């Protein structure tokens, strides 16, 4: 699944307000019941939408929803997984990669849609992007959720051939996690060092357009198959 273009999805709920009906104190009880029934019928019709007896209107609405959903989903270049206290640092790295190196679009995990399960957001973030960047800071080891994130990302890169070498540990300039304290599973992967003199060269070698296009193609094919199975 892809990830939405906007950083934070705004999903206002349209709550239909029921017009208050003033009951006539001197009226009969039957009139009051009739008024309530009429009000309830109007509320149900307004909430569900009045549909014509034929199915002519249903099909255009279904067709119109497809392109809109496709526009909202986009395969990303990268996602940055980070500790909760490192959101600002993650945003700085995102800005660095997008504006200084032209690697876009990218997203940080804190920008994933609200109101959804963390696991669903994690799955969408990892599978909806070409590279998964693990922001290795001092806060990384203190956050249990970060440990789960990097183990899940590594398992995903191993189990799916096209995601091989897609997990990129990165030590940023601010409060980087020392190598000796880095989890053993991540020590086996060559990390992206922002303070290194070869940082720019590393970035160019990692984020290659050919790799992105290949993963994007597989992502589109997977989505197409899933949509066909859902319709069937």
Curated annotation (Swiss-Prot):
Disordered: annotated span: 1-70
Post-translational modification remark: Myristoylated. Required for membrane association which is critical for its ability to initiate efficient signaling. Phosphorylated by PRKCE in response to LPS. Phosphorylation is essential for its function. It is depleted from the membrane upon phosphorylation. Tyrosine phosphorylation is inhibited by phosphatase PTPN4.
Upper taxonomic lineage: Eukaryota, Metazoa, Chordata, Craniata, Vertebrata
Keyword presence, Hydrolase: no
Cellular component terms per the entry's GO annotation: cell projection; early endosome; endoplasmic reticulum; endosome; Golgi apparatus; interleukin-1 receptor complex; late endosome; phagocytic cup
UniProt cross-references to SUPFAM superfamilies, sorted A to Z: Toll/Interleukin receptor TIR domain (SSF52200)
Modified residues (Phosphotyrosine): 164
GO molecular function: interleukin-1 receptor binding; phospholipid binding; protein heterodimerization activity
Lipid-substituted positions (N-myristoyl glycine): 2
Annotated InterPro entries: TCAM1/2, TIR_dom, Toll_tir_struct_dom_sf
One Gene Ontology term from the biological process aspect of the record: response to interleukin-12
Principal location listed in the UniProt entry: cytoplasm
Name of this chain's protein: TIR domain-containing adapter molecule 2
Domain TIR, first and last residues per copy: 74-226
Compartments reported by the entry: Cytoplasm; Golgi apparatus; Cell membrane; Early endosome
Basic and acidic residues: compositionally biased ranges: 1-39
């Amino acid at each position: 699944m892809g990830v939405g273009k906007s950083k934070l999805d705004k999903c206002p709920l349209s709550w239909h307000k029921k017009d208050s009906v003033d009951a006539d104190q001197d009226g009969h009880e039957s009139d009051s019941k009739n008024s309530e029934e009429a009000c309830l019928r109007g509320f149900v019709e307004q909430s569900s939408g009045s549909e014509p007896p034929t199915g002519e209107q249903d099909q255009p609405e279904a067709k119109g929803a497809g392109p809109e959903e496709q526009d909202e989903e986009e395969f990303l270049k990268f996602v940055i997984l980070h500790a909760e206290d490192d959101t600002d640092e993650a945003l700085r790295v995102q800005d660095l990669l997008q504006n200084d190196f032209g690697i876009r679009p990218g997203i940080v995990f804190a920008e994933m849609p609200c109101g959804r399960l963390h696991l669903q957001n994690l799955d969408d973030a990892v599978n909806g992007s070409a590279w998964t960047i693990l922001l290795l800071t001092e806060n990384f080891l203190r956050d249990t959720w970060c440990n789960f994130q990097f183990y899940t990302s590594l398992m995903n890169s191993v189990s799916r051939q096209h995601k091989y070498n897609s997990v990129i540990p990165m030590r940023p300039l601010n409060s980087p996690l020392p190598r000796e304290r880095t989890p053993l599973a991540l020590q086996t992967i060559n990390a992206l060092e922002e303070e290194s003199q070869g940082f720019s060269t590393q970035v160019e070698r990692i984020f290659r357009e050919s790799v992105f296009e290949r993963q994007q193609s597989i992502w589109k094919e997977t989505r197409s198959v899933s949509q066909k199975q859902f319709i069937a």
